[in-house]
Curated annotation (Swiss-Prot):
GO terms for cellular component: cytoplasm; ribonucleoprotein complex; ribosome. It comes from Paramagnetospirillum magneticum (strain ATCC 700264 / AMB-1) (Magnetospirillum magneticum). The keyword rRNA-binding applies. Keywords: Ribonucleoprotein, Ribosomal protein, RNA-binding, rRNA-binding. The lineage of its organism: Bacteria, Pseudomonadati, Pseudomonadota, Alphaproteobacteria, Rhodospirillales. GO terms for biological process: translation. Transmembrane segments: none annotated. GO terms for molecular function: rRNA binding; structural constituent of ribosome. This protein binds to 23S rRNA in the presence of protein L20. This is Large ribosomal subunit protein bL21. The gene is rplU. HAMAP family: Ribosomal_bL21. Belongs to the bacterial ribosomal protein bL21 family. Part of the 50S ribosomal subunit. Contacts protein L20. It holds the Pfam family Ribosomal_L21p.
Length: 100
């Protein structure tokens, strides 16, 4: 069975046993997380969420994404700015999908 969940403003299609990278969630490695913004479970489609459905996951690690370079330049003005950014991520392992 699969589910579509929403966390951090993004949607993810998950199945039991999947490992996904999501926007930072509170919790140390080994902590249990319950995601209740379930948009779809199997053939049930929520309006906007499926009532009573939840997805349980275990935090594998807290990590950081790859560095993104932000470069801004104004032409002919000798004006430029370069910044780097690394997003904080949480790596989750999906343990259980409950249809509710």
């Amino acid at each position: 069975m699969f589910a579509v969940i929403q966390t951090g403003g993004k949607q993810y299609k998950v199945a039991s046993g999947d490992v996904i990278r999501v926007e930072k969630l509170a919790g140390e490695a080994g902590a249990e997380v319950v995601l209740d913004q379930v948009l779809m479970v199997g053939d049930k489609i929520g309006v906007p969420v499926v009532a009573g459905a939840s997805v349980k996951a275990t935090v594998v690690a807290q990590a950081r994404g790859e560095k993104i370079i932000v470069f801004k330049k104004r032409r002919r003005q000798n004006s430029r700015r370069k910044n780097g950014h690394r997003q904080d991520l949480t790596i989750l392992r999906i343990t259980d999908i409950s249809a509710g």
